[in-house]
Each structure stands twice: as structure tokens, then as C-alpha cells.
């Protein structure tokens, strides 16, 4: 009973709170460094850094429309600190999950439009390239390690990735160890899971032994409300797209064939069958529900990514509790597959803003990726792996968490990372169509043929609409 009460309190806290702000992380860093410099030295360094930031900040203002709700508090704290140091107003607004494109359209129509926004890749850039300032020649572009992390239109640099992320099936190490110690366990270690067939056998067995293991299900709820459905209509849907592209040697298409949709079906069936909740409840289940279920030990597996680290460790889970598996769908050769790694987060500066606001926005971005405070916040508070040179100058600015380590481990083992092909999805309307069909299939009000139709026919329709065909 005590365990259940504590767990309930943790889950409530998780839903009610977000990530720890940058101020707390800065305080920890100051404490850690206390043995190497005096308080006066630290204060002097901070004052000098503030003076430098103020000198370069410009006379405009910054309005950042943030894409990531899970980092909203951290961005607010970082913006407030920059304003304190420079006097430059930095406003951070965060779009609700799943609404970024609509929110951006609305905000761009206002007289006080965002000076800093983001696109998800080349498809997103196509909609907004007329708003994008050329970032070539800026201090931000000088910090990028490779043009692999930028979006170009001709020679113009119109977007710069600010985080490289990885997703897969996060698992609770301790629960897996407890399962593996049970009589008749399918595997002796999570390391033996290297295919869909093995994953399904393990998940089915955990589901059958859930009471003995003390969980509600093998997988967290596959919630299909707007705070969670992107995990399945976008991130999970990436797998059949990736394998089709891989077979054809392409990076985009005007007409997806759906070669691997049967594989998509079997992983989706596994998620919604070996679950913490009844399929009929999925339409109302949220991202917070899934995170809380995992953090409280109600499920062994949780599809999400490195960005979820702060949420699931905020209330009890430790680094030792976390591992990550590839998302196996039964594709040929998947035993050599790694995790899904890429970016859909590219900063763009609004070229229609005033020159003063543009320069202040560029100065803010330079400070974010080069200052001690900015780097600490991105790497350690937000948990980002970034493509910027300044983060390589000190190991403390390299994000260290077991989910990132898992990704590095698969690469070191020679596994092939799964590319983020979902950035080629033709539109948000296409994603929503697939999401609706998945939901109806899960709750028994639709069939899988409707998913295929939304996936294949919907792709052709939306691609043609997006490209004026």
C-alpha cells in the first residue's frame, strides 16, 4: 500500500510539473565548481560574461515560438536570465503539442510576429522559406559542425538544427531483470531482443505474468490524444517509410506504396494488446498518462525518445533504471538495426522582423550555443545533443544520460541507425488522417484497410496538394 501511495504522488507530480529550470542547474554547477575557484572568481566570471552578452545583444527584442512543450520551462528560465544580463526582452511562447504549424500561421499574421521559429525539415521549409533569414555568415552558422545539420535553399542557409535526437522503445531495466529471473522467461537479458518476433514473445509473456511482475501491462498506454498521437502517426509510422525508402534507395516520394504496412500493423497490434489499458480508452489517453505509467513502474516498455529523459527521471527513476531498444517491426535484416536518430528541429529567423529584432535574435542564439549558461541548459537541463562546435570544448556540455548512451552503444556495435524519414511526410493533414484511422482501428470502429487508405491514398493526395499538382 505504501508503494502505491508513493507512486500515486509521483505520478501526480509528474503531470503537474515539467523540467527543472536552468536556474537550478546553474546552482548545481556552481556548487560542483566550488573546489576549483573562489566565490569572488566565479562572481567575476559571471559579471564578465554578462557584460559581454550585453555588449553584443543589440537594441531589439526576441520572440521565440518554441516547438517543445517538455522544454518550455527551461526556455522560459534561460530567456529570463538573458534578459536580466542584457536588458533585451526575450519572450518565449510554446505551442500546444500537435498544434505548432497552426500556431505559427496564426502568430505570423500578427504585427508582433515571432522573430525565431522552427521548421521540421525540407517539407516544413517549403511552407516558410519566404520568411527565413539567410543564416550564412552568422555566428550561429559558424558554430555548426557540418552542413548535414542545415537546411538550404540554393546557397542560402535557411534553417539550422539545434538538437539531434533519438527514439526507440525505452525499457525499465529493473523490471526487465525481474522478468528475466522468472521461471520460463523468454529471454535471459534484454540484450537478446533483436527482432520483432522476440520482442512480441517477451511482451506477450510479460502481459501474461503482469500480476506476478506487479505491472499493469508490458507497454504503456498508446494514447491517441494530441499530446501523444505523434508517437504513432509520425514516429512509429517512420519505420515502414524508412524500410520502403531503403529498398528503393530514395529519400522522399510523391507516392508511398505501403510495402511495410503489414509490419506497421503488427507492431501497433502489439502496443495496443499488451498494454496497461483497454483499447477502447486509447482515444483519451495522454502523453502524461504514458510517462506516469512508466515512471511509476506500471509498464516495462515505453515508446519515446531522448527528450523524455527529464520527465521520466523527475520523480523516482534513475539512470540505472533506463535502457532503450530499437523499434522492431519484422523487417528483413532488422537484427542489424539501431535506434531512430535525426532532427526535426531547425531554427529559422524571421527575415520580415525589423533589423534590430533580427540582430538581437541572432545575438541571443549565439549566446545560447556559446555561453556557459546556455550550453549547460541545452546539454544538462534540456538533455540535448547538439551539432555545435562549442559543446565539444568541455565534456560537461555533452548530454549524459542512459538513453543517449544507448544510442551511442548501438552505433559502436555497428548497428545502422534508422533515419528520420518522417520529415518527408507530405503534411500535418496526412498525419492526422493516419492517426484517426489508427484510433478507430484500435477501438474497433474501423478496420486496417482504412489505415492503408489513409497512409497510401492520403499521401498521394496531400503531396499533390502541397506541391501544387
Regions found by a protein language model. Give the residues of each.
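Extracytoplasmic/periplasmic substrate-recognition and gating elements
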Residues: 110, 315-383
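Extracytoplasmic/periplasmic solute-binding protein
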Residues: 156-162, 167, 197-253, 299
Amino acid at each position: 500500500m505504501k508503494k502505491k501511495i508513493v507512486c500515486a504522488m509521483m505520478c501526480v507530480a509528474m503531470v503537474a510539473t515539467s523540467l527543472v529550470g536552468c536556474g537550478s542547474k546553474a546552482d548545481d554547477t556552481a556548487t560542483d565548481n566550488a573546489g576549483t575557484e573562489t566565490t569572488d572568481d566565479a562572481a567575476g566570471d559571471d559579471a564578465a560574461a554578462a557584460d559581454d552578452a550585453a555588449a553584443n545583444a543589440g537594441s531589439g527584442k526576441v520572440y521565440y515560438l518554441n516547438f517543445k512543450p517538455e522544454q518550455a520551462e527551461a526556455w522560459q528560465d534561460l530567456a529570463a536570465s538573458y534578459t536580466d544580463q542584457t536588458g533585451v526582452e526575450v519572450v518565449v511562447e510554446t505551442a500546444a503539442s500537435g498544434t505548432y504549424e497552426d500556431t505559427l500561421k496564426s502568430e505570423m499574421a500578427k504585427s508582433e510576429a515571432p522573430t525565431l521559429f522552427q521548421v521540421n525539415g525540407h517539407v516544413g521549409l517549403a511552407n516558410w522559406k519566404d520568411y527565413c533569414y539567410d543564416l550564412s555568415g552568422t555566428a550561429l552558422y559558424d558554430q555548426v559542425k557540418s552542413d548535414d545539420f542545415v537546411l538550404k535553399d540554393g546557397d542560402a542557409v535557411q534553417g539550422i538544427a539545434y538538437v539531434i535526437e533519438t527514439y526507440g522503445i525505452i525499457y525499465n531495466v529493473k523490471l526487465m531483470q525481474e522478468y528475466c529471473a522468472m521461471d520460463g522467461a523468454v529471454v535471459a537479458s534484454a540484450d537478446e531482443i533483436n527482432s520483432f518476433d522476440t520482442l512480441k514473445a517477451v511482451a506477450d509473456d510479460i502481459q501474461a505474468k503482469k500480476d506476478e511482475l506487479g505491472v499493469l501491462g508490458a507497454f504503456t498506454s498508446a494514447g491517441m490524444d494530441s499530446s501523444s498521437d505523434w508517437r504513432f502517426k509520425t514516429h512509429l509510422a517512420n519505420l515502414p517509410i524508412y524500410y520502403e525508402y531503403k529498398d528503393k534507395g530514395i529519400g522522399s516520394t510523391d507516392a508511398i506504396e505501403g510495402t511495410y504496412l503489414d509490419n506497421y500493423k503488427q507492431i501497433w497490434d502489439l502496443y495496443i494488446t499488451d498494454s496497461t489499458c483497454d483499447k477502447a480508452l486509447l482515444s483519451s489517453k495522454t502523453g502524461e498518462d504514458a510517462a506516469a505509467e512508466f515512471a511509476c513502474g506500471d509498464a516495462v516498455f515505453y515508446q519515446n525518445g531522448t527528450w523524455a529523459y527529464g520527465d521520466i527521471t523527475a520523480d523516482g527513476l534513475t539512470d540505472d533504471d533506463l535502457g532503450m531498444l530499437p523499434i522492431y517491426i519484422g523487417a528483413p535484416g532488422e537484427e542489424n538495426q539501431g535506434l531512430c536518430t535525426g532532427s526535426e528541429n531547425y531554427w529559422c529567423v524571421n527575415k520580415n522582423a525589423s533589423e534590430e529584432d533580427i540582430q538581437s535574435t541572432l545575438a541571443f542564439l549565439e549566446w545560447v550555443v556559446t555561453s556557459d549558461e546556455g550550453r549547460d541548459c541545452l546539454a544538462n537541463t534540456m538533455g540535448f545533443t547538439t551539432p555545435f562546435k562549442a559543446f565539444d570544448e568541455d565534456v560537461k556540455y555533452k548530454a549524459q544520460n542512459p538513453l543517449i548512451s544507448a544510442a551511442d552503444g548501438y552505433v559502436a556495435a555497428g548497428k545502422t541507425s534508422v533515419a528520420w524519414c518522417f520529415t518527408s511526410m507530405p503534411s500535418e493533414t496526412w498525419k492526422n488522417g493516419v492517426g484517426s484511422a489508427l484510433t478507430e482501428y484500435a477501438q474497433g470502429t474501423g478496420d486496417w484497410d482504412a489505415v492503408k487508405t489513409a497512409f497510401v491514398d492520403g499521401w498521394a493526395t496531400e503531396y499533390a496538394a502541397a506541391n501544387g499538382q
